[in-house]
Each structure stands twice: as C-alpha cells, then as structure tokens.
Amino acid sequence: MEASKVFFTNMRVKNGDNLLKKLDRLMRAAGIESIDFDKRFTAIKMHFGEPGNLTFLRPNFAKVVADLVKEKGGIPFLTDCNVLYVGKRTQAVDHLNVAAENGFSPASCGCPVIIADGLKGTDEALVPLEGTTYVKEAKIGHVIMDADIVISLTHFKGHEATGFGGALKNLGMGCGSRAGKMEQHCSGKPEINTELCRGCGACKRACEQDAIVFDAEHRAHIDQEKCVGCGRCLGACNFHAVYSPNYVALDELCMKVAEYTKAVVQNRPCFHISIVMQVSPYCDCYGGNDMAIIPDVGMFASFDPVALDAACADAC
C-alpha cells in the first residue's frame, strides 16, 4: 500500500505574506482542487470554542477554506454537533450564540453556521458500519451525513482522555450526536483513589455534571449515575487521585472515535486540515485554556486523517 501524503507549511512568514495566504497555498498543494465542489454542499467541521477559551482556531482560517470552496462552485457551511456535558454548547441556540460570540458568522467566515445534530442534539443519522470492533451503527449528526463533501478543520492540541485531539477526534467524537458521544464515552468512567485525594475540590469544579461528592472526611467520590465519562476530572487533579479503573477503556474510546470517523468519511470526498498552534494541554471544550506546552509548529493537510494525525503528533 502506498503511503499517504501529508503536506506541511511552517508558521513563518515573510513581509507581504501571511498565514491565511499560506493556508490557501497549502490546501491547493495538497490537492483539494481535485474534488468536484460544483453545487455540492460542503461541511467544514470545526470547533467553535467554549466561552472563555481562546485557543480555538480563529474564524479567519475558516473563511480561507470557505472562500476556496465557493471559488470552486461549492456551497460551504461551518458545522459542529452539540456536546454531551453540561455547558454552553449542549443545544443549538446556545451553541450558535457561542459561535457568534467567538466570531463565527456569515459576515466573518463567508458562510453560515449550522449545528449538525439539531436543536437538542437528537437529530441524528444512523450509519451502519462493517468490519468494526465496537460500533456497528454510528449515530452521526444528520446535517453531517446530508453533506456531499466533508472538510475537517482541526486545532491540534492535547486531550485528557485520548492523548491528543486531532482530525480523528474532530471527526469521530465531534460529528457524533449527543447519543453518539455517550456511546463513545460510556465504556470508561473515572474513579477516585481516596487515599490520594487531598479534598482540594479541583475535580468538583471541573465537573459540569455535579457528579463529584465529598464524604465526611472530605474525600471525593464520583456518582457513577451522573458521570458521563468526559474525563475532565482526570485533567483537573494534580495528585493523581482520579484514574481510569480500566485503561483498556481509554483504548476502547480511541477505537470508537476511529470507527465513528469511518462512518463520517466513508463513501464521499473528504479533505483534512490540522493547525498545530497554541497547543494547550487539554481540549478546547474547557471554559479556559492553559498556556501552550510547545511552540507553534505549522499547518498540515491531507486526504488521509490517520496519516494527518500521525504527522502532527510526530511533529510535536
């Protein structure tokens, strides 16, 4: 099998040039113009950020992608699905308001924003899968499956459950409906080693499900009925008290993400872009972000999301 090609450009610019022009050249060099966009609905899958988080990709990058699609006769729109955990993006009204607050609009991006799984995160398409280990029928946001073409535009960063968040995470977890996200997360919920717990409350502050309770000795415990397995408490604890009781479950999560990605990309044209800048240790779903853990690396593009993730990880 021939190795997939991944194209790269660094973040350096000369006078008269800029990163937006470099992104346009990168996409063309990687072969995006080989896709027939004419009169075809093109979903640009990205993350609109959580209020207070400033590491999500700027709307300017989305506009470059949308403008190229329109140049080729396509009909682009920006999209994401609602999230599982409690926050500002669990339903489409708040989600659209967050996108607007963070600068994503037809005026700034040249195309509309559509929440792919509808008002309450229940508008899903059931996509049958063959040859998979865990997922036999993926629950994907209906708008994603209605699109003729999918382009993933990903902020590559760390992630507390999957190690890093790249194209596969953006496509697999990101395109899942709320029920689809639950299916991916549900195999592994964290627990707390009370001997290591300091009672600091960091895990409780990170939990938006109100699933953390304290006993008489002020040791934390997780209410498994309320827990959705998002893993935020894992990243919040500085004392290694929060852990996965079954590390195979994290492997299973990653495999489910990959299988959900297969449901999204199979049987239609797809193209993938990852931007490795402001690499925060955790995902952009938090209402804040830590400083970058490495210097900015560059921008990558490929028709193969697996090769793209591998290249980004290797470059870090």
Model-derived segments and spans:
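Terminal amphipathic helices with adjacent charged low-complexity linkers/tails
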Residues: A66-D67
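Extended, low-polarity segments enriched in aliphatic/aromatic residues
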Residues: E2-F61, E71-D80, Y85-C316
